[in-house]
Amino acid sequence: MRVTVGQYSHRGQKPENQDFHGACLPQDHQLASKGVAVALADGISSSNVSREASQSAVAGFLQDYYCTPDAWSVKQSARRVILATNSWLHAQTRRSQYRFDRDRGYVCTFSAMVIKSATAYLFHVGDARIYRVHGDNLEQLTTDHRLWVSREESYLGRALGMGEQLEID
């Protein structure tokens, strides 16, 4: 398998870039047993600690995924790591000054892709997006987890660290 990875992030209109992204392309037996992993996270703009949440989520996923047993499937490995990361981020918020305001805590969106053999596995929480580029076509592969209050107002419905429970696409 040959994989080329390119990554770029821009802060947009925000004063600080709270995005974090990374990839792991193992060169040893883990390439066959675990595959190639790519992850990205975007902190919520209302929080001063979202950059830390994003960095922890991506770095933790890329490190911990490869520490899971080879007997576990890609889905089981990734889900367990993401759920553990969610628990850790939520606990960080509960122990911090932000414990009563989840919009200020350790919260971020998270999307990851693991490519193993000829299969791409997607794991997604929030409104960061994964697209497939094929020729001149751009196809969105993930669903935004936003709840719309009106045509102009919406809020994030799912994210890492937002609550004790987490539903992962």
Regions found by a protein language model. Give the residues of each.
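PP2C/PPM-type serine/threonine phosphatase catalytic domain
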Residues: 1-169
